[in-house]
Each structure stands twice: as C-alpha cells, then as structure tokens.
C-alpha cells in the first residue's frame, strides 16, 4: 500500500509540474534549477555507513573555496603512484570501496574525496563547474595521479579540470556524458516538462554558477585530450545513453570503449567484468610500457 501511495504522489507531482511549466514557465524553471543542483540527501547516510565499514582508510578535511572537503587516503600518495577517484552526482567517494584492495595490491596509493554537498563534505548544493574546481584543487593538493578513475559527472568533469599544470597519466571514465546541456534537456523531455521553462532554468543556473551550458561542451575539449583512456558504458544506461559514451570515446584520441550489457548507470561499478577490465588497463607494467 505504501508503494502505491508513493507512486500516486509522484505521478501527481509530475502532472502538476508539467502543468506549471506550461502556465508558469518562469517560476517552474527556477524551481527545477534549484532541484537540479541539490544532490539527494539520502546518499549521505550511505556514505557514513560505508565509512564505518571501511578499514585502513585515513580521512582528512581540506578547506577549499570555503567548503570543508572530506578526503580518504589509502597508502601514501606522496611516496607511491596514486589513483584519484571521482564519484558521480548524488554519490560518494566510498562507492569505490570494493576497488581499494585490488588497487593497493598493485602498488597504488588511493585518494578519494566527497564533492561539496555529498558524503561527509559540507555544502547543500553543487553543479558541474564546482565539480570541475574540486577535482582541480584536490588533484593539485595531492599531485599528479598515475590514474584518474571517475564515474558519471566525476568522469565528465575531468575533461575540463585537467590543464598544463595538472594532468593524470591515464584515465578510466565510467558512464560519462559529452554535454551537460544534453543531460538537462533529456531530463526535461523524459519528464514531459515544457521547453518554455528551460530559459528560466538555465538563467537561474547562470546566476548561481556564472557559467553557461555552452562553456561545458565536451565535443570541443575531447579532441584535445592526451593520455590513454578507457571509457566504460552500459547499453542499458537510462541516465546517460550508451551512445553518449560511445561518442565520448570516439572524440578522445586513442580512447578505447568497453561496453557492458544490462548493468545500467550505477551497478556497473560493482561488476567483476568492469573491475577486471580496469585493473588490466591500469596495471603498472601496462602504464610503464604504454600498452593500450
């Protein structure tokens, strides 16, 4: 009965949003923009539980841009080649917890961090420009990583985070998107929201971030990317269609696409086939020999 009541409530809310986007597109767009930059709070409790279940991890708080960022370290990134982990939207660093023993056994130190408004870090909102800035600042704090592993928005953001001063040697990017504008438009279309609300939606985001969607068009940056890259995407990804990942891989010079079936957007992070593919791609002898 609870599930039925919840479903009826969600359908009613969706109907009202669709109607409001037609009648009051300005306020509706602004409301949707606020939701767009607010991660799901429920994931914070999952992050806390994951930390309680973790062993051998060292936590540290960095204050970056006035935000307290929680970092997680295994090994010594100042002495060992390290892997930098970047989680996706409404997720947390310890989502990669199952990967840590294998990464450590290969001789890597590992660094993860919770984005603002995610996991144990402070803040209430986040957005792609801030994702990019945090990857840059955390990366520069710990130095050049031997490997960058990112999921979803964490994977897409690194395209704009790396520059001449800071660039990982090798990339593993799971379920990335090419353009944030495409994701936003797709969400509008899937929910049946009137396009008339999109103008105020983007205007509100600009007032918060000072950036336009057009500034984060991956198709312009991807052809300039350097370093071996493994792109992983599932054909049944409902959040970011497989075609986006395939295009991402095609635009990145020399990138390799690994496709999974039936794992969706999130479950592929836990699947042995994905983890094994990544470990083979980043094993030290592969990197030292630059074998793709």
Give the ranges of each region predicted by the language model.
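Short beta-strand/loop motif that positions the catalytic acidic residue
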Residues: 224-226, 231-233, 237
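Hydrolase active-site cap/lid region
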Residues: 163-211
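Alpha/beta-hydrolase active-site loop
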Residues: 125-146
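Short alpha-helix in the alpha/beta-hydrolase fold that links the catalytic acid
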Residues: 99, 218, 227, 241-250
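Catalytic histidine-centered segment of alpha/beta-hydrolase-like enzymes
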Residues: 263-273
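An N-terminal hydrophobic leader/cap segment in hydrolases
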Residues: 3-61
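Gly/Ala-rich beta-loop-alpha elbow adjacent to hydrolase catalytic centers
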Residues: 149-158
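Conserved alpha/beta-hydrolase
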Residues: 93, 100-122
């Amino acid at each position: 009965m609870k599930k039925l009541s919840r479903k009826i409530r969600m359908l009613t809310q969706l109907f009202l949003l669709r109607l409001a986007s037609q009648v009051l597109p300005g306020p509706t767009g602004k409301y949707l923009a606020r939701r767009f930059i607010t991660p799901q709070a429920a994931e914070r409790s999952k992050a806390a539980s994951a930390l309680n279940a973790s062993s051998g991890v060292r936590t540290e708080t960095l204050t970056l841009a006035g935000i307290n960022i929680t970092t997680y370290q295994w090994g010594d990134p100042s002495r060992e080649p390290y892997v930098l982990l970047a989680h996706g939207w409404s997720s947390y660093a310890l989502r990669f917890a199952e990967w840590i023993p294998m990464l450590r056994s290969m001789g890597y130190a590992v660094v993860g961090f919770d984005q603002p408004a995610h996991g144990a870090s402070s803040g209430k909102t986040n957005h792609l420009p801030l994702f990019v800035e945090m990857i840059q600042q955390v990366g520069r704090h710990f130095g050049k990583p031997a490997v960058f592993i990112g999921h979803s928005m964490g994977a897409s953001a690194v395209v704009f985070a790396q520059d001449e001063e800071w660039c990982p040697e090798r990339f593993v990017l799971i379920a990335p998107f090419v353009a944030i504008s495409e994701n936003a438009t797709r969400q509008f279309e899937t929910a049946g929201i009137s396009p008339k609300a999109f103008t105020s939606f983007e205007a509100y985001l600009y007032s918060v971030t000072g950036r336009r969607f057009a500034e984060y068009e991956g198709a312009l940056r991807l052809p300039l990317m350097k370093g071996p890259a493994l792109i992983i995407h599932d054909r049944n990804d409902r959040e970011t269609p497989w075609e986006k990942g395939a295009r991402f891989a095609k635009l990145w010079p020399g990138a390799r696409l690994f496709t999974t079936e039936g794992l969706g957007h999130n479950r592929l992070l836990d699947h042995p086939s994905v983890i094994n593919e990544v470990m083979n791609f980043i094993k030290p002898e592969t990197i030292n020999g630059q074998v793709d």
